[in-house]
């Protein structure tokens, strides 16, 4: 459906829901269920390496920081005027995971060609039960149904994206089991994120200053050196790997002689880290511009009701 298509009852309903969500007001359980059932049909048709055209704005972790997502849209432009590619970790840690992920899924439904939403390591049943999304769903809906609806939907999110055959985008990093993009295209991704193996690595690995493959301190995925990213980019005719997954104080960080960039889009992460956030604008000519931003003003934010583990990875 084009951005300027004739309104139907479905798009009018979606526009109303998006308007409600932009005010940080959650949808009903029934609305979430209907939205996610339809979203599943769209996401099912997308590739494990989803092709994306430029211009596009590439974003990193959001982690339930809804007001900062609204600030991101204010700075970068609202969908569908701006095309977006989000690289995962929409939920956990922040206070508004429900509103954040619902808004992104609603925008995906309304403008499927204008927004791409990849899976992060937090789009998982196991992780969300520890780091906040499960508890938030219980608090806001009185039961775990919405958590189950979303975690079932997460299984359908694409794992990676490819911007104009040049920029490879994913949440985490590379895998010793993956040499080519075709290796990724051949996965069955519709499952909970495994504890090990190539699908796990794509969502958990990190670039490192040391050459070769290393054991990750996270307990999942690997670290990979410049030699690995150079070989992967050469084999697959890529110019850049864009990824998220790590807090970087300036909102973005180059690695491996500008073969890899980390983008992090949650400013003052966990409401205490003091970092900037950034987004990466890629224009029609594939030129890159980083836009940094600070936290949005927050009003009436709740206190954290229960201490969550200090897992800053």
From Swiss-Prot:
Binds 2 manganese ions per subunit. It is found in: Cytoplasm. InterPro entries: Calcineurin-like_PHP_ApaH (IPR004843), Metallo-depent_PP-like (IPR029052), PPA2-like (IPR047129), Ser/Thr-sp_prot-phosphatase (IPR006186). GO terms for molecular function: metal ion binding; phosphoprotein phosphatase activity; protein serine/threonine phosphatase activity. It holds the Pfam family Metallophos. The active site is at 122 (proton donor). It catalyses: O-phospho-L-seryl-[protein] + H2O = L-seryl-[protein] + phosphate; O-phospho-L-threonyl-[protein] + H2O = L-threonyl-[protein] + phosphate. Its EC number is 3.1.3.16. Its main location: cytoplasm. Mn(2+) 2 binds at residues 89, 121, 171, 245. The modification Leucine methyl ester is found at residue 313. CDD domains: MPP_PP2A_PP4_PP6. GO terms for cellular component: cytoplasm; cytosol; nucleus. One of its GO terms (biological process) is stem cell differentiation. Its cofactor is Mn(2+). The keyword Protease does not apply. Reversibly methyl esterified on Leu-313 by leucine carboxyl methyltransferase 1 (LCMT1) and pectin methylesterase 1 (PME1). Carboxyl methylation influences the affinity of the catalytic subunit for the different regulatory subunits, thereby modulating the PP2A holoenzyme's substrate specificity, enzyme activity and cellular localization. Phosphorylation of either threonine (by autophosphorylation-activated protein kinase) or tyrosine results in inactivation of the phosphatase. Auto-dephosphorylation has been suggested as a mechanism for reactivation. Mn(2+) 1 binds at residues 61, 63, 89. Keywords: Cytoplasm, Hydrolase, Manganese, Metal-binding, Methylation, Phosphoprotein, Protein phosphatase. Coiled coil: none annotated. Functions redundantly with PP2A4, and is involved in establishing auxin gradients, apical-basal axis of polarity and root and shoot apical meristem during embryogenesis. May dephosphorylate PIN1 and regulate its subcellular distribution for polar auxin transport. Involved in the regulation of formative cell division in roots by dephosphorylating ACR4 protein kinase. PANTHER family: SERINE/THREONINE-PROTEIN PHOSPHATASE PP2A-RELATED (PTHR45619). PP2A consists of a common heterodimeric core enzyme, composed of a 36 kDa catalytic subunit (subunit C) and a 65 kDa constant regulatory subunit (subunit A), that associates with a variety of regulatory subunits such as subunits B (the R2/B/PR55/B55, R3/B''/PR72/PR130/PR59 and R5/B'/B56 families). Interacts with ACR4. Interacts with TAP46. Interacts with SIC/RON3. Belongs to the PPP phosphatase family. PP-2A subfamily. This is Serine/threonine-protein phosphatase PP2A-3 catalytic subunit. It comes from Arabidopsis thaliana (Mouse-ear cress). The lineage of its organism: Eukaryota, Viridiplantae, Streptophyta, Embryophyta, Tracheophyta.
